[in-house]
């Protein structure tokens, strides 16, 4: 019998392979691959665009993979299409590349009220599960991304990581550079030794909450459109991706 591999092991391996440089806007990021019916592609990209423009995606950069093409070890079947989109663990990889120790802790559902994040309502730690927590919560239909976009209040997917509080200034510089590069997915940066969105952090640590990369997929699911997402799929050079507003469908 094969040993179980908790999702944290895969996350840490992929973090180490991230080469993205926000200042140069070059390098490899971690992407999720979504498989959809080709006939739904135009509508799905429209929904993804809504999520991006509402600040509910990791990055506006995407790539469409056509039927018959292959990305990583995923081959797109006839009458299907693939969409590669940024995974939030890319943020951890960029922090790590900058020499900042970072430990992804958990994924969950965050309650938003009038545009402000209140608290995590449901969480799963990365070292306690063999599958991505955000996939679990999306499959249980616990999100209300549509309501969030329409009203400013709702429940979205997010995750949290810890870093040493002594690295705070450097963390803020790196996060600012990511925002300038289009990765405007930082939900909240906590104070040292203080809870973040109701979740306790370790001693001499600070928490960083980031919007989950699967919120656009949750929006599609809420609209009763079939979508099969494979989180933490591969690393992809960002220069192979284009802004969602420039995608040719």
Describe these PLM feature segments.
Residues 1-13, 22-249:
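Conserved mixed alpha/beta catalytic, RNA-binding, or beta-rich assembly cores of soluble enzyme
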């Amino acid at each position: 019998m094969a040993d179980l591999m908790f999702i944290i092991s895969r996350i840490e391996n992929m973090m180490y392979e991230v080469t993205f440089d926000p200042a140069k806007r070059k390098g490899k990021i971690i992407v999720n691959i979504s498989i959809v019916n080709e006939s739904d592609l135009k509508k799905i990209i429209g929904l993804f665009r809504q999520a991006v423009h509402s600040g509910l995606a990791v990055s506006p950069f995407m790539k469409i993979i056509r039927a018959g093409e292959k990305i990583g070890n995923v081959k797109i079947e006839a009458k299907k299409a693939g969409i590669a989109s940024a995974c939030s663990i890319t943020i951890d990889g960029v922090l790590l590349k900058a020499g900042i120790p970072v430990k992804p802790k958990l994924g969950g559902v965050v309650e938003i009220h009038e545009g402000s994040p209140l608290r995590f309502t449901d969480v799963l730690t990365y070292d306690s599960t063999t599958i991505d927590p955000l996939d679990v919560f999306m499959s249980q239909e616990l999100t209300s991304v549509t309501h969030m976009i329409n009203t400013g209040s709702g429940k979205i997917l997010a995750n949290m990581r810890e870093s040493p509080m002594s690295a705070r200034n450097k963390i803020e510089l790196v996060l600012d550079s990511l925002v300038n590069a289009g990765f405007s997915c930082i939900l909240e940066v906590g104070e040292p030794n203080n809870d973040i969105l109701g979740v306790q952090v370790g001693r001499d640590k600070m928490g960083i909450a980031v919007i989950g990369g699967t919120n656009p997929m949750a929006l599609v699911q809420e609209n009763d459109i079939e979508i099969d997402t494979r989180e933490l799929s591969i690393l992809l050079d960002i220069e192979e991706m284009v802004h969602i507003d420039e995608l040719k469908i």
